[in-house]
Amino acid sequence: MKNIKIVRILKHDEAIRIEHRISELYSDEFGVVYAGNHLIFNWYQRLYLSRNILISKKSKSRKGLIQMIFIIGICTVFLIIYGIWEQRCHQKRLNSIPIRVNINGIRGKSTVTRLITGVVQEAKYKTVGKTTGTSARMIYWFTDEEQPIKRRKEGPNIGEQRRVVKEAADLEAEALICECMAVQPDYQIIFQNKMIQANVGVIVNVLEDHMDVMGPTLDEVAEAFTATIPYNGHLVTIESEYLDYFKEVAEERNTKVIVADNSRISEEFLRKFDYMVFPDNASLALAVAEALGIDEETAFRGMLNAHPDPGAMRITRFADQSKPAFFVNGFAANDPSSTLRIWERVDDFGYSNLAPIVIMNCRPDRVDRTEQFARDVLPYIKAEIVIAIGETTAPITSAFEKGDIPTQEYWNLEGWSTSEIMSRMRPYLKNRIVYGVGNIHGAAEPLIDMIMEEQIGKKQAKVI
């Protein structure tokens, strides 16, 4: 073997793509069997036998080649055996948890996950909930303390679901409520069919987001979400243009469809929450309760007892103590539908009458979103002042000059620092509603931090 010399000359982008796929699918030494023996064979073929690997002339002897194939064969057999064993262990753990719910969609998944967790827990099931995203949390029935999920350097990975299932099984949980963490359609299939095998699937909504992965159209997004529809179980979703499509897929899978009914959710009930809850959020949780045979009274009580997500929407009082301004952080709701929906809730509570200031944060790498907001959002919010911050604000300026944005004043503060923006706004921050929209990253994050520093009475913050 001393004369064998192997040199990899994979093209850089190809190597990254292969290694990323292997990292995604084989994270934590899990699921080798999931990918199938074909992929394993191809991987080793690429590594040792393909045109992308050069074997020096000295190593081309028959003996060296046989030794190499033998080692590859041993490693492959070991990985397959380990993968099968791990798969069986994982399946045994899943089978020990009778209620498994998978929540998918674009907006509001975390809130719906928490509401459902609260409902099932209130019904006296030993319940474990899991939210994903930047504030991923584990929620347990036996304590009010939530456990932040610590992720490795590679970031979120569907392989972490194995650890979640193991922990839930070790705790002898009776219900596992999980927010789907997969975005790519293939991974959504793996998440449902291998990782959680939910018997209740929830599709919160179908909106434009991650179109580079799930798109290019909403039809493809809806198709991707069909991975959430279980076999021989329940699908819970809302009224939408894709409802009939989801029903067809559910029928093929012998799954019962329950359509969330917003008429069962009163405004009085929604006002009891100390954070923003949309009617859809609550009606979806109520529909899951129906699927699980949980009575309505228990379901409503469980929703109210559910803990809010760290990123839950609130109206924050800040600036002047006697005549405060009220801040609504909608920067992260980066699509027109969600942004306008939040504003509708603000209007329901009467805040839209407080001489609104709308702050539009623009990014140079999201010009298409800036143009979309100039066309589909800002014309429909009656603001007294519209402020453009960040970079590449030209689409907003152009829309204002054309008369498309109905506002008394327009401030183009492109490139201004956070302190300069606050100084410019400060004389106007009395008895006003301030609504941030567009993009969370860039100029918005430090502005939010500065506003939070001026928050008046954290416990007195009004919620929507």
UniProtKB/Swiss-Prot annotation:
Inducers of expression: Capsule synthesis is transcriptionally regulated by AtxA, AcpA and AcpB.
Pathway: Capsule biogenesis; capsule polysaccharide biosynthesis
GO MF: acid-amino acid ligase activity; ATP binding
Transmembrane feature ranges: 65-85
Keywords associated with the record: Capsule biogenesis/degradation, Cell membrane, Membrane, Plasmid, Transmembrane, Transmembrane helix, Virulence
Gene3D superfamilies found in the cross-reference section: Mur-like, catalytic domain
Topological relation to the membrane, as annotated: Single-pass membrane protein
S-S pairs: none
The keyword Lipid metabolism belongs to this UniProt entry's keyword annotation: no
InterPro entries for this protein: Capsule_biosynth_CapB (IPR008337), Mur-like_cat_sf (IPR036565), Mur_ligase_cen (IPR013221), MurCDEF_pg_biosynth (IPR050061)
GO process terms (BP): capsule polysaccharide biosynthetic process
A Pfam family per the record: Mur_ligase_M
Gene Ontology CC entries for this record: plasma membrane
Locations listed in the record: Cell membrane
Primary role: Essential for the synthesis of the polyglutamate capsule of B.anthracis which is one of the principal virulence factors during anthrax infection. May form a polyglutamyl synthetase complex together with proteins CapA and CapC.
Protein name from the UniProt record: Capsule biosynthesis protein CapB
Gene: capB
